[in-house]
Amino acid sequence: MSLTKEFKADVIKQFGASEKNTGKSEVQVALYTRRISDLTGHLQLHPKDKHSRRGLLMLVAKRKKMLNYVKNIDIDRYRKVIAELDLRK
């Protein structure tokens, strides 16, 4: 399932300070998380799809880098994002 405009708007409202703040790190992590979950579901149906698996690994790496950035800037924001997205760190 792709990211719809409505879903993106909801994520921006939830994690961003305003509706126009799409570049905030928390917003980007939330969008990466949704794309990762979509690709994970796709790979469960199509286990031999190696190109999508590579894309999934690249998204996981991007999310990890973004989470490390948030953790280095403000640990409280990091913990809040981890709790809201139910990530394992």
UniProtKB/Swiss-Prot annotation:
GO-annotated biological processes: translation
GO cellular component, as recorded: cytosolic small ribosomal subunit
Matches recorded under NCBIfam families: S15_bact (TIGR00952)
PANTHER family linked to this entry: RIBOSOMAL PROTEIN S15, BACTERIAL AND ORGANELLAR, SMALL RIBOSOMAL SUBUNIT PROTEIN US15M
Matches recorded under HAMAP family: Ribosomal_uS15_B
Quaternary context: Part of the 30S ribosomal subunit. Forms a bridge to the 50S subunit in the 70S ribosome, contacting the 23S rRNA.
Family stated for the protein in its record: Belongs to the universal ribosomal protein uS15 family.
Listed name of the protein: Small ribosomal subunit protein uS15
Organism in which the protein naturally occurs: Pelodictyon phaeoclathratiforme (strain DSM 5477 / BU-1)
